[in-house]
């Protein structure tokens, strides 16, 4: 069982995982598609402070590597339901945790 389950492995989800890990929590991040999120599809990203021009794929890889380096567990799976009643929260993938964070984006953002 994990202290926190983050649903969504894009920039927001991986950032949430990093903050939880820094607070000493055990974290599982569940992503149904691509860790790093939609940014991984961008050929060039130039709007992150302190990071010069980088491909979205490279940036997504850096986000993912940092979460793993800090101790996050990453799982590729699709969450179809969440049970929020009681002290232990459950997702349909059978992982349990005390907190569930949902950080999702649009299915496909317009370009």
Where are these regions (language model features)?
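Gly/Ala-rich phosphate-binding loop of Rossmann-like dinucleotide-binding domains
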Residues: 17, 21
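Flexible, glycine-rich phosphate/dinucleotide-binding loops
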Residues: 13, 36, 54
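Surface-exposed, flexible loop/turn segments at secondary-structure boundaries
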Residues: 35, 47, 111
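Amphipathic, positively biased hydrophobic alpha-helical segments used for protein targeting
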Residues: 23-27, 31, 47-48, 61, ...
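N-terminal Rossmann-like dinucleotide/flavin-binding domain of flavoprotein oxidoreductases
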Residues: 40-98
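FAD-binding core/adjacent interface of flavoenzyme oxidoreductases
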Residues: 1-7, 22-23, 74-111
